[in-house]
Amino acid sequence: MSGNSSTDMYLFKKSLKELKGKKGKGTELISVYVPAGRRLSDISQYLRQELSQSSNIKSKTTMKNVQSAIEVILQRLKLLKEPLEMGVIIFAGMIPRGGPGTEKMEVYVLEPPEPVKTFVYRCDSLFYTDPLEDFIQDTEVYGVILVDRNEATIGTVKGKTITVLKKLTSGVPGKFKAGGQSARRLERLIDDAAHQFMVRIGEYATESFMPILEEKKLKGLLLGGPGNTKNEFAEKDYLHHELKKKIIDTFDLCYTEEFGIRELLDKASDLLRDLDLMKEKNLIQRFFKELIKDDGGLSAYGEAQVMKYLEMGAIDTLIVTEDIGITRVTIKCNNCDYTQEVNVKTNEMFKFEEQLKTKACPTCGGAMYIDEEKDIIEHLSDLCNVHNTDIIVVSTDTEEGSQISRAFKGMAAILRYKL
């Protein structure tokens, strides 16, 4: 992997999406999960046994395709160096490109972001990708409870995603200002209703957060809201005692709904400095601070400008959105050594391939062909490694990421020096 967590995760998710869309003609697609630390010789021996048993498959075509896939995996295993700290996942099989006879062998070798725990060998019409789903789940979760006398919101912040789990209203009226016994009795009723509301919040919080805590994924609880209600809720025994230990801090807020969660995240930014959401937000805000300077500061944006400055080694931090949708294509001449690299919108690759059929080499007039296709983010990550540039792949689910996507077509940068 590249060594950059956001790039690695983006490429891993992309591979997963592609793999889930692959379908074989029969039960002839092979999936192999090799656990971390497992001897490759043991895996190879197991696969050779499967290769031998595959001769019993009745359909000659299916038998041939299964055997070809196993042989390809055996070849790939020979190229790997032990020990494998994370393990490895290999998919191989004949994938139809159209009608009968259009099948082509496809092989995918993935280094997982977390160690593979269990050996899996599966032969099916689809690649077995269920375990990969677990790898892309953010493990650290923050619980959020926003509360005032009238309403409450319970939610989670997980990576870049804010999820509202429950909204509650109390029905508790405001304080009664008049005097007399009736007023005091009414005030007691109001206080009792407020207490019962706190109990309900605690019950829903326990129901929402205890399963996450038991999975050891709950990093902490953040409490917020206007007034003193949040402090009362935190200090008294409304929360499960194990959850109470997870309270990180309380925050004075103006709101108690989803906007309040965003307000809380702003106020808790120092505490959540390592959370992906805050990393992205702070970095993009830094870019915009440079952008609004009279001379443009240390900002760069757009494909042409960013590519130019990156190849010069002038970029400190590169920001790319997940939805950029560009493929880096290397085309070559059949006749001479002419080579060209171009960026093509991924959804226009078919059109590009058709146009290439009529394109002649500018050097000798020979026919051109596609030598390599690479996701632009993978290409940019390789360039960043060469020039010691940080790269972060941001989600468009956030307001800041969406701004980069819309305004700058998914590519922006902070420079090392003014150009």
Swiss-Prot record:
Gene Ontology molecular function: any one: translation release factor activity, codon specific
InterPro entries, alphabetized: eFR1_2_sf, eRF1_1_Pelota, eRF1_1_sf, eRF1_2, eRF1_3, Peptide_chain-rel_aRF1, Peptide_chain-rel_eRF1/aRF1, Ribosomal_eL30-like_sf
Matching SUPFAM superfamilies: L30e-like, N-terminal domain of eukaryotic peptide chain release factor subunit 1, ERF1, Translational machinery components
First-listed, main subcellular location of the protein, grouped into a coarse class: cytoplasm
Pfam families noted in UniProt: eRF1_1 (PF03463), eRF1_2 (PF03464), eRF1_3 (PF03465)
Alphabetical UniProt keywords: Cytoplasm, Protein biosynthesis
Subcellular location per the Swiss-Prot or TrEMBL entry: Cytoplasm
Gene Ontology cellular component list: cytoplasm
Top-rank lineage group of the source organism: Archaea
Subunit details: Heterodimer of two subunits, one of which binds GTP.
Family, per entry: Belongs to the eukaryotic release factor 1 family.
HAMAP family: Rel_fact_arch_1
Function summary: Directs the termination of nascent peptide synthesis (translation) in response to the termination codons UAA, UAG and UGA.
Name of this protein: Peptide chain release factor subunit 1
Originating organism: Methanococcus maripaludis (strain C6 / ATCC BAA-1332)
